Curated annotation (Swiss-Prot):
Catalyzes the conversion of 3-deoxy-D-arabino-heptulosonate 7-phosphate (DAHP) to dehydroquinate (DHQ). Transmembrane segments: none annotated. GO terms for biological process: amino acid biosynthetic process; aromatic amino acid family biosynthetic process; chorismate biosynthetic process. Disulfide bonds: none annotated. The gene is aroB. GO terms for molecular function: 3-dehydroquinate synthase activity; metal ion binding; nucleotide binding. Zn(2+) binds at E184, H247, H264. It comes from Neisseria meningitidis serogroup A / serotype 4A (strain DSM 15465 / Z2491). This is 3-dehydroquinate synthase. Keywords: Amino-acid biosynthesis, Aromatic amino acid biosynthesis, Cobalt, Cytoplasm, Lyase, Metal-binding, NAD, Nucleotide-binding, Zinc. Its cofactor is NAD(+); Co(2+); Zn(2+). Belongs to the sugar phosphate cyclases superfamily. Dehydroquinate synthase family.
Amino acid sequence: MKTLTVHTPSHSYPIFIGNGLLPQAGSLLKPHLGKRAAIITNETVAPLYLGTLQTALDAAGVSHFSIILPDGEAHKNWQTLNLIFDGLMQNRAERKTTLIALGGGVIGDMTGFAAATYQRGAPFVQIPTTLLSQVDSSVGGKTAINHPLGKNMIGAFYQPQAVLADLDTLHTLPARELSAGMAEVIKYGTLGDISFFEWLEQHMPELMALERAPLIQAVYRCCQMKADIVAQDETEQGIRAWLNLGHTFGHAIETEMGYGTWLHGEAVAAGCVLAARLSEQLGKISAADTARLAALLEAAGLPSAPPVFAFEKWLEHMSHDKKVSGGIMRFIGLNRLGEANITEITDTDILRRTLQPYL
């Protein structure tokens, strides 16, 4: 097991990364739990891992109840959030009841937002069961639900008490979901660590085969990078925006196609290539750099091109992006592979040129 600590102005918390951790969840997490816990999970994860977690909590003397939600990005909304609140109130959850998110990014985001708002703030912990959530969404305190006009538009910054990432849960992950998570792994190398990017180029087959040693190394490096960035910029006033590489274009894809049609990681993959193409247009990187990024994404089973839709739709969706400031769109671009930047775009013609092959 590897452990690292996330330090933020609000508080610090541990991330536990390894294999076979879920049966130890009671003992590992007990210092970070109240006397009672609410497990929030979904219909897919519950049959696989809920029983193991319940047994672990019983052994640690933590009482608990469970709330099982429908699965999928299409359910990341007010209606499903209210199911969490209904379950908490029906079970007389108190402010010190710890919410436990057992699932992927959707469960983690919604559980965190429920925790941030239930009785004005209850503690929560993350037990991410997908690669995407283990390397990205479970760490850093971003919580949200979607709105029909934009992804993650309603939410809060609210840090968990702990994160427990059991890599064994990835063995039940569908291949498409594994690839989607790998998009976020590749994103980290692309935005801030060229040596990690090169390591991914060398080890992608082993990672996709879930070989234990390279997998734990990759997950640890991603969490380490995110922890370092979040420590500097908890509420995304500056450098943390780099973690949104590919997300401005990616969220536009998800919104246009309907939440869940393209998985988040698939949209981010295509979005990263578009961000690279935009950086090409600005003279920052070469076409060869963009091709190299696209090749790595494709090696992970990911799309390197977006779906085709009208330029006006792209602009409409991207105008709702959370990085927009003073009406000016801001994109995360690249100075080079391994180094991101924040780019303000006032001339939409450059966006049209970037997107032209896909209009």
